[in-house]
């Protein structure tokens, strides 16, 4: 997805000692405190905008394949969409070859177009856009795919205050700390999640989507 960004502070962590207590505890094997956002059988709690046919449930996964569309998590009451501020999100993801998708955080439902609020965590292991899976689009650019196509991998996103931490298969890719004074709508605030169907040539699967609210 193409849009402009203005950012100037990224912390890349080779050894995430400072995250050991915080993120390490949150990724405990028992998943205590996590709530499931996807029931594995339907799109209940989710709302697609333009081109809703780009979404289906297949073999226990949400599959995006078709023209541009975004699937917003709204929760049990679409009139009052669910909202998250500090959280730890986990999802299992599988990309097909040359597929592009994304996971939006702190966003808001809208009828069409690229989401105007929040950040996009890129999902792309081999498509023409060189910005690969895990990148915070137009903010933190990762050019080495951390996972392979046609293989399930675990994507984790944690937001605490102004810090965004992304992991793939248990490995910390980076911590981004948003600078003070950011204006506009592409910033951390609060909001919901959205999945992206990028284009008709892209197919990506999502399953076991769950979140834990953090203080």
Q: Where are each of the predicted segments found?
A:
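Bacterial N-terminal signal peptides that target proteins for export
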Residues: 2-15
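Bacterial N-terminal signal peptides
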Residues: 14-24
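Carbohydrate-interacting regions of secretory-pathway proteins
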Residues: 27-215
């Amino acid at each position: 997805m193409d849009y402009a960004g203005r950012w100037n502070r990224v912390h890349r962590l080779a050894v995430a000692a400072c995250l050991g207590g915080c993120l390490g505890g949150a990724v405990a094997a028992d998943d205590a405190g996590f709530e499931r956002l996807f029931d594995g059988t339907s799109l209940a709690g989710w709302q697609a905008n333009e081109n809703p046919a780009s979404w289906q449930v297949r073999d226990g996964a949400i599959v995006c394949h078709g023209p541009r569309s975004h699937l917003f998590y709204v929760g049990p009451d679409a009139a009052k969409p669910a909202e998250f501020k500090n959280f730890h999100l986990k999802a299992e993801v599988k990309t097909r070859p040359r597929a592009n998708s994304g996971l939006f955080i702190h966003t808001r439902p809208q009828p069409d177009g690229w989401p105007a609020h929040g950040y996009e965590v890129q999902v792309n292991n081999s498509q023409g856009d060189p910005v690969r899976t895990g990148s915070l689009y137009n903010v933190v650019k990762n050019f080495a795919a951390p996972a392979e196509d046609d293989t399930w991998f675990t994507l984790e996103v944690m937001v605490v205050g102004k810090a965004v931490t992304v992991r793939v298969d248990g490995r910390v890719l980076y911590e981004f700390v948003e600078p003070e004074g950011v204006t506009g709508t592409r910033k951390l605030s609060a909001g919901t999640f959205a999945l992206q169907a990028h284009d008709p040539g892209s197919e990506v699967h999502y399953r076991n989507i769950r979140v834990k609210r953090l203080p």
